[in-house]
From Swiss-Prot:
Name the UniProt record assigns to this protein: Photosystem II reaction center protein H
Keyword Thylakoid recorded: yes
GO molecular function, one term: phosphate ion binding
Annotated SUPFAM superfamilies: Photosystem II 10 kDa phosphoprotein PsbH (SSF161025)
Role played: One of the components of the core complex of photosystem II (PSII), required for its stability and/or assembly. PSII is a light-driven water:plastoquinone oxidoreductase that uses light energy to abstract electrons from H(2)O, generating O(2) and a proton gradient subsequently used for ATP formation. It consists of a core antenna complex that captures photons, and an electron transfer chain that converts photonic excitation into a charge separation.
The gene coding this protein: psbH
Amino acid sequence: MAKRTWLGDVLKPLNSEYGKVAPGWGTAPLMAVFMGLFLVFLLIILELYNSTLMLEGVNVNWTALGS
């Protein structure tokens, strides 16, 4: 039999819902929305790095960052 520890006793409530599945889609649509927003964020960063997205007054000089 497994030894009981204080950490196991603290974490047990987090595992009390094991095996139970919410009916339907649950929070999957909300997760998809946040994944889409994260994708847009990454695309904006990529375009800034690639200099394909130009912002007025923002000078991106990557060589200056290295020195």
